[in-house]
A protein has these predicted regions:
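Kelch-like beta-propeller repeat domains
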Residues: 1-386
Length: 386
């Protein structure tokens, strides 16, 4: 692997310009001091509303003290370019950014304050970030460049399947491959039975599941394919097709595993459906998790201008991702706060659901106002810290 120098490597994280959380901590006496976890996410970031400079940055949320900190800039990204449709997974204390598509932000001529995205390329690039040494390195590239694909870790190997190889056009692929982190090598896997993109990958029952997505198989009832899943048996080296595993013809937003259960909270059109759902593999159905009903992740006291005036008008959500840690589900939300052209900021809010509790499962931590506007580029990943 080739080492890289992050654009921020010469600057201490404590002095870098980045969305910085307010000095608010939340005592959590029920938490054990060890093990410690960090929830990492990649954002597009700009400091001012009319800012022409947009960066791709990675932040870390510490669930013990309810605080965001700047980790680093993502290397290899030009100014005003953002990365989307990539996978972000962890193996040990390393984070891998796999594939994705690069877009360039450009101002619209008719309205200089508004930006549009222009597709640049689909990447095969794989980056590795060590959370201990804070160093980036490049790994062996994907065999097939892809974005909007399924990805998950099983037995310390990274599995990817499906996705798209072009930025324009709704054309998916059915190829799959696996990365050995020790050998720094990608190996092709058998093709799935149908093409899929915007599908979700998750490891469940020691098998790599590729769930939902937009599909094509020539089926006269295409929604049947979009409701299905492909399951790769690592030991047998073959795919199985599971009908009706997702139930919707709209792709899922995110699926995680907690206490050996599959968990979902929304789809790509409605990322928060108002409740958490869990999968019953015996019935092949999704059911609401008891006590998880929560109509809105934004408290009613928050208004569109960031003040507490009792208005129910919601802020514009630009971030929502879910992470599982032990028996907890964390929902990390971010909302754009309107301001003048000289500044902008984001309100960060974290909710936690305790799957082991029988009542009062929800807890909402103190909101944080962070400098600049940061919009989520991909789902988060969890790292157990040494």
């Amino acid at each position: 692997m080739e080492s890289l120098t992050s654009p921020s490597s010469s600057t201490s994280p404590s002095t870098e310009t980045f969305p910085r959380s307010s000095l608010i901590t939340v005592p959590m006496s029920s938490e054990r001091p060890n093990p410690r976890y960090g929830i990492y996410a990649v954002f597009s970031y700009k400091e001012h509303m009319d800012d022409d400079s947009i960066s791709c940055v990675m932040g870390c949320y510490d669930p013990l003290i309810n605080t965001w900190s700047h980790e680093c800039f993502v290397p290899g990204m030009n100014d005003n370019h953002i990365l989307k449709g990539f996978a972000m997974v962890s193996v040990g204390t390393s984070i891998y950014l796999v594939g994705g598509s690069v877009y360039r932000k450009e101002k619209v001529k008719e309205n200089g304050a508004r930006h549009t995205e222009v597709g640049v390329e689909v990447r095969s690039l794989v980056l590795r970030y060590d959370v201990v040494t804070k160093e980036w390195s490049t790994c062996a590239p994907l065999i097939t460049p892809r974005h909007d694909f399924a990805c998950s870790v099983c037995d310390n190997k990274i599995y990817v399947a499906g996705g798209q190889t072009t930025i324009d056009g709704a054309i998916g692929i059915s190829s799959a491959e696996v990365y050995d982190v020790l050998r720094n090598e990608w190996t092709p896997l058998p093709f799935m039975s149908i093409v899929r993109y915007k599908c979700v990958g998750v490891t469940y029952q020691k098998k790599f599941h590729v769930i939902g997505g937009f599909t094509y198989s020539g089926n006269k009832m295409p929604f049947m394919d979009r409701c299905s899943a492909e399951v790769y048996d690592v030991e047998k080296g073959k795919w199985d097709h599971v009908r009706g595993m997702w139930q919707l013809d709209v792709p899922p937003n995110q699926i995680v595993v907690i206490d050996n259960k599959l968990i979902s909270s929304g789809d790509c059109l409605n990322v928060w459906k108002g409740q958490i759902e869990t999968y019953d593999r015996n019935l092949n159905l999704w059911f609401p998790l008891e006590g998880s009903r929560k109509e809105n992740l934004l408290p009613i006291a928050c208004t569109s201008d960031g003040n507490d005036r009792g208005s129910s008008e919601p802020l514009q959500r630009i971030c929502l991702t879910m992470a599982s840690i032990e028996t907890y589900l964390y929902f990390l939300a971010g909302y754009r706060i309107a301001g003048d052209h000289s500044s902008c900021c984001t309100m960060s809010m974290v909710h936690r659901f305790d799957t082991s509790a029988t009542n009062n499962q929800w807890e909402t931590f103190e909101p944080m106002q962070v400098e600049g506007e940061r919009e989520l580029c991909s789902h988060c990943c969890v790292v157990q810290l040494p």
